[in-house]
Structures are given as structure tokens and as C-alpha cells.
Amino acid sequence: MTDLRGTLTENRPLADLTWLRVGGPADLFFQPADADDLAAFLRADLARPVFVMGVGSNLIVRDGGLRAAVIRLGRGFNGIRIDGTRVRAGAAALDAHVARKAAAAGVDLTFLRTIPGTIGGAVAMNAGCYGTYMADVFVEATALTRAGEAITLTREDLNFRYRQSDLPPGTVITEVVMEGPPGAPEALEARMADQLAKREATQPTKDRTAGSTFRNPAGFSSTGRADDTHEAKAWAVIDAAGMRGAMRGAAQMSPKHPNFLVNTGGATAAELESLGEEVRKKVFQATGHSLHWEVIRIGQPGRTPPA
């Protein structure tokens, strides 16, 4: 791998790259210079598992770290270009940045404004908010296969579902094309400001969290409307099970919004994941709803200290 132009690091700790600030090291950590550099890296070691990491906003890295190569796209993958109502964004572009740029150009991608993460991650998990999903605006994506081959992914290829897509394992999205409805920039800006105010009022935005911990049992996102009477929301069933504010070590289900798992200071990945599993158990016992993790959990457990 001597011809790579990006940055390659062995045994790179990952905790400082995740919002929850937990987790062990990755065997390899690579930040490619561009798509050609990324393709060369992928071809160089076909047997090694790879994991694509965005900004670490929806992620628990377990305490034992990751026996894989972690790829993090950076400056060479965050450009944004707008042509009419079509928006072409690098996979590393932040969702919020794309929403703002699109709004300024009169394109409505406002649902992305409050979603923490990158556009590549938004495609992989069909991110959505306020009743709109990536699937609703997705046109196509450029990607590299695990073998380093450039491909184009269509909506049919990805088979979007609630918080899921059929992105092939090892595939790295590099660029995404979206198309949103037209709108007046001032109105779009006002809508995003309203969304941000609602988030600030209802979510623990100043705490160390990974965003929504569990998917809504109903299988769709909240619309955010006052008249949305749908009851099968993750936060509601967690509340019904009496788990708002529950703690395990330094891990806590937020008292402000019980579907947010919080590192109150010094929590381990094991504590966070264990509390999440306890919540799932209590919710099923109390309500009959099976919660499914929305936060991605990767890596090996840490060693248990001797008694």
C-alpha cells in the first residue's frame, strides 16, 4: 500500500471520532485523497473487512475495537453542485450543509437539516425526518465495490425501506444525486429554523448522544406535525416501560427524550449497549413492542476485568 496518497494509520483509536466518545481502535484507518486513491486501497487487500465511517453520529464502537479497515471520506468527497432542482453531493458532505445549500438555491431538501451525519450515510440507512426520506429524493449514487470497481446505484438497486437499504456489503458510496421540489429560499430557510427550534426544545442536543437509539416500531418516521396521533413511537413505548432516565454506569436514557442514549461522562460502549438491551427487554415486557436498534454497533467487546 506504499503508493497510496491518503492517510493510512494502524491501530487508530476511534472513540474521539464518534459522538458518544467510546470504543477501541481499528486495525487500519484510511482517509483517501480521492476516488482513485480509494479504489487502489480497496484493491490492495481484498480479504480485509471494511467499514465506512462518516462523522460517527449514529455509531457505537465496542470497547475491543474493530478488526477491519475503517474508511473515512474527507475533503475530496464533500463537494456540492446544484443544477436546477438536482443536487449532486459528495458522500462526505454533511446532511445539514446540503440542506442549507439546496435551500439557498431554491431546492427543498429541508428534511436533511436536522439529521446528523453525511449524505453517504443517509443513503445507506434511508435517513428521514418530518415524513420525508432519502428514498423520496434519491436519483442515483456513484460507488466503489469492495474490489474497487466504479458502479452506479439506482433506486431499484438499493430497495429502500424504513431505515434500511440493500447497499451491498463493502460498497463505498462516493457521490449522490438527489432531486427535490422547488421552493422559495426564504420559506425553506424559515422551515429549517422552525425544525431546529423544535429539535432544541425536545432533544438533548447538548449531550453526548448518537441520535435516535431505536427505530419507531410503526416502521416510519414521525411527521413532526402536532396532529400526528400515531402512538407507536420509540420514545413513547420507552416512556411507557418506565425507562426514561434509566442508567447503567455512566450510560443513561435521556430524561429529555427517552429514545436518546447518553454518555453522561466516562461511559463504556459496553454500558451503553447493555442499557439499550435492557430497554428493549423492558419495552417488550411492558408493551409487546420489539424495538430494533437504529444506532449501528460494530466491533469486538472489550476484555472483562478480573474479579
Curated annotation (Swiss-Prot):
Main location: cytoplasm
Keywords for the protein's UniProt record, in alphabetical order: Cell cycle, Cell division, Cell shape, Cell wall biogenesis/degradation, Cytoplasm, FAD, Flavoprotein, NADP, Oxidoreductase, Peptidoglycan synthesis
Listed GO MF terms: FAD binding; UDP-N-acetylmuramate dehydrogenase activity
Protein's pathway: Cell wall biogenesis; peptidoglycan biosynthesis
InterPro entries documented for this protein: FAD-bd_PCMH, FAD-bd_PCMH-like_sf, FAD-bd_PCMH_sub1, FAD-bd_PCMH_sub2, MurB, MurB_C, MurB_C_sf, Oxid_FAD_bind_N
Superkingdom of the source species: Bacteria
One Pfam family hit: FAD_binding_4
Cofactor: FAD
Boundaries of every FAD-binding PCMH-type domain copy: 21-183
Compartment(s) of residence: Cytoplasm
BP GO terms, sorted: cell division; cell wall organization; peptidoglycan biosynthetic process; regulation of cell shape
Catalytic activity: UDP-N-acetyl-alpha-D-muramate + NADP(+) = UDP-N-acetyl-3-O-(1-carboxyvinyl)-alpha-D-glucosamine + NADPH + H(+)
UniProt EC number: 1.3.1.98
Gene Ontology CC annotations of this record: cytosol
Gene3D superfamilies: 3.30.465.10, UDP-N-acetylenolpyruvoylglucosamine reductase, C-terminal domain, Uridine Diphospho-n-acetylenolpyruvylglucosamine Reductase, domain 2
Bias-annotated ranges (Basic and acidic residues): 200-209
Feature: compositional bias, Polar residues: 210-224
Region (Disordered): 200-227
Residues the record marks as active site: R163, S212, E294
UniProt record similarity statement: Belongs to the MurB family.
NCBIfam families to which the protein is assigned, alphabetical: murB, PRK13905.1
Function: Cell wall formation.
Name the UniProt record assigns to this protein: UDP-N-acetylenolpyruvoylglucosamine reductase
Protein source organism: Dinoroseobacter shibae (strain DSM 16493 / NCIMB 14021 / DFL 12)
Encoding gene per record: murB
